[in-house]
From Swiss-Prot:
Protein's GO biological process: cysteine metabolic process
Similarity field: Belongs to the class-V pyridoxal-phosphate-dependent aminotransferase family. Csd subfamily.
Protein's name in the database: Cysteine desulfurase
NCBIfam families in the record: PRK09295.1, sufS
Keyword Lyase part of the UniProt annotation: yes
HAMAP family noted in UniProt: SufS_aminotrans_5
Active site annotation, chain numbering: 364
Pfam family of the protein (one): Aminotran_5
GO CC terms, sorted: cytoplasm
Pathway given in the UniProt record: Cofactor biosynthesis; iron-sulfur cluster biosynthesis
Amino acid sequence: MSFPIERVRADFPLLSRQVNGQPLVYLDSAASAQKPQAVIDKELHFYRDGYAAVHRGIHSLSAEATQQMEAVRTQVADFIHAASAEEIIFVRGTTEAINLVANSYGRHFLVTGDSIIITEMEHHANIVPWQMLAQDLGVEIRVWPLTATGELEITDLAALIDDTTRLLAVTQISNVLGTVNPIKDIVAQAKAAGLVVLVDGAQAVMHQPVDVQALGCDFYVFSGHKLYGPSGIGILYGKSALLQQMPPWEGGGAMIKTVSLTQGTTFADAPWRFEAGSPNTAGIMGLGAAIDYVTELGLLQIQQYEQSLMHYALAQLSQIKSLTLYGPTERAGVIAFNLGLHHAYDVGSFLDQYGIAIRTGHHCAMPLMAFYQVPSMCRASLALYNTREDVDRLVAGLQRIEKLLG
């Protein structure tokens, strides 16, 4: 059965607008994806017809909202094949999820002299929290280097591990290069050495099925807004045995069992001990609708459609003589490039005048820019609503810029 691209595009209202007098070509979904009408309607319905504060409310609206929120927790667990809904923590996004692990697991279990491993392709969100932790605790950060093709050589991992190594933090798919890391094999090697493994799935969950139990990782993190859901909501998956040992990171309402001015505070069980304060309930509802949307389409079908589109895009872009492509041939989601010696910002500005939205800059991956010895790159990202016509518009725009600027 062919992928229903016309129906899919009709589901996303913003795709029908014009930018600078041109039909919009949106190629920036890796930064944040557009929202289907079903997600917009779900949030609107909650605010209009069912809004109430969750937890501890005796009245019907509160009970209904709490039940719906917890149903989404179960839905997320099913979506990534977690063993239990109690392994799912609602956070603001990938960045907060990684910071939670660094500040709760890291500060509780790591000591001076320990070491952790990150890779050269990580987003700043999977670098800076570990650097802050290392500075405070005296922990060493070891960097898994890239190959010339922008990939990780799994045989290089063993050389980074010794009896001080406690944790590996690695992205599943690079937000710049689209490199798809062999996470299952990486996790197996790390676990054999006794490491805890955090996987950044922010660029993966929208492009392929994810099974955290099959991957074997201890933590898995992603954001809703890249999965066609609302902004301000994300997920931290953690194995139950680890979560129950971890102390809270933030204090406040909803994460306690008891509070006494003389006896101190006792904390709720995981996952609720990590969800201080009023949650983004509408965002949680919208995330549930987004998961429903991609599940109905089928992640395997989405993956197959996007891979076909990626192969077409790479073939077309490779015909532009002055264009430099970065990263491996086999990739998912994103295409990083530069056009001659022109600054990425200039290229992006010209494309915007043609109604084409891409991302330009260092993409929160300055170490990766240093690896390629460039200050910035252009990045076009492909999503389930993009088409060959979108790719053709991008190629034509780049050829026009090439002709104008030389």
